[in-house]
Amino acid sequence: MRRKQARFMATLCRPSVSVPEHVITMEETLELARSRHADHPQLPLALRLIENTGVKTRHIVQPIEETLKHPGFEERNKIYVSEAKARVPSVVQRALDDAELLTTDIDVIIYVSCTGFMMPSLTAWLINEMSFDATTRQIPIAQLGCAAGGAAINRAHDFCMAYPKANALIVACEFCSLCYQPTDIGVGSLLSNGLFGDGIAAAVVRGRGGEGIELERNGSYLIPKTEEWIMYDVRATGFHFLLDKRVPATMEPLAPALQDLAGLHGWDAADLDFYIVHAGGPRILDDLSKFLQVDPHAFRFSRATLTEYGNIASAVVLDALRRLFDEGGAQDRARGLLAGFGPGITAEMALGRWRTDEEAV
């Protein structure tokens, strides 16, 4: 009698998420816009767009009075570094605990962030500070913006498939409030000022065992000739975020990419059990529901993140997944889709099945 050959599938485990203690409400955001831009000819439009985001609260690393100041790019980046070092380790530790692993079990750290810069990457500091093994690989990703959460999941999946039984740690650290530019007063900038928040998330992809999403396939898609639709203009004052007015409509060309990926796997993107996607704004979720022909309730986790935290960039997809875990997870072998959207315009997509915490054999 032949023994069943062991199969090792990468499993995305429960994410750990933390947001800073300073909170700003939509009402406070609207009042700030009115008081600081009272003479702006398009203020009514900006206020309406901010209200339409549905973002009720956002969390930021500094009190709003400090956030509104601009001490210079150098000082802001120092704040990014100090806040990341103060806040990331506890989030990482919770993710490791949830995955029932130690730092010495991790083979690669994938660190994503687009709101500050460090060299060496925070990965090097984490390896030293938290006693990861010195042979731990480092993959910092700095220029995929909001798509980086999905990209990190996909690169972790790739790594665990290339090295069976390996374990990957994903860390997303985004302090969007440190990118506030008081001189940027275009409608797109005013909208961004009411949309983005700060947050940190971490999750482990286990090469063997664990409860969560057993990753089966991933893919990427870039909408041609849209690289200027979401971008940074890097100046002496730091990162100036540019958002084209055509961005909210990008789900119409991206939905077919999601359908194609599912089709390659023999699945129907309109008939899955759970959806974990980046919520850049409410229209993204509304249009995904429309073009994928999926009940809006399917995107409740992503919408809750947007409502309670705002757009926390690469950390959104991990927080949405955390909410699925908090709801009790999905049925064993339930099928689902994960996706991050960001500059490029890029979609990073993954398909997987829910699995309980049993050894895959």
Task: Describe the role of every protein-language-model region.
Residues 89, 114-115, 121, 125-128, ...:
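Claisen-condensing/thiolase-fold acyl-transfer catalytic domains that form or cleave C-C bonds
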Residues 55-132, 138, 143, 269-285:
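Conserved beta-ketoacyl condensing-enzyme motif
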Residues 118-124, 170-191, 219-236, 282-290, ...:
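Active-site-adjacent elements of ketosynthase-type condensing enzymes
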Residues 13-16, 112, 142, 168-174, ...:
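Short beta-strand segments
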Residues 134, 141, 151-155, 175-199:
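Active-site glycine-rich loop that binds ribose-phosphate moieties when present
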Residues 61, 83-99, 155, 200, ...:
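Short, well-ordered amphipathic alpha-helical segments that serve as non-catalytic structural scaffolds
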